Amino acid sequence: MQQNGDSLYARYCRMGRRFEISGGLTLAAAIAGHVTTGGNGLLSVLMVVGFVLFIFGAMNMKPSNMIRAFATQLSATNDPDFAKGLIDAMEKNGVTALSKASLSSLNLAINTYAASEGADEEIVTRLCDAYKKHVRKTMF
């Protein structure tokens, strides 16, 4: 699944940044065109597209969303690459507060991977340690 030795976490972060940058550039170009030409419908559509791309990128870079995305993929596939990506997402973002739904998704992913055939014990231990050190429940 991995290419060029990149971790899935690094690829996920790069993709989020690409969305932010392309959205920001599209939005800036559409605003500049709107200001210089006095506006038109196509430029308004481009502004919306740029804004949406920027928001998607920003939301993907939010630590709680990263953890939930990797947890969802891990529980669906039981792939050790997604387990390593989940570990990276928890460790590289410091202490992350998760909602009840995200916590249950994360617990499901860890338990499903730990119970699967051929689960690497070292990865399971690292998942549990990262969970204990870097995840806490939100206040509400």
Where are these predicted regions, by residue range?
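Hydrophobic, membrane-inserted alpha-helices
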Residues: 25-33, 51-52
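Short, aromatic- and cysteine-enriched interfacial helices/patches
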Residues: 42, 55-58, 138-140
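Hydrophobic alpha-helical transmembrane segments
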Residues: 29-52, 58
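Cytosolic juxtamembrane N-terminal segments of multi-pass membrane proteins
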Residues: 1-16, 131-134
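Transmembrane-cytosolic junction motif
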Residues: 14-15, 55-74
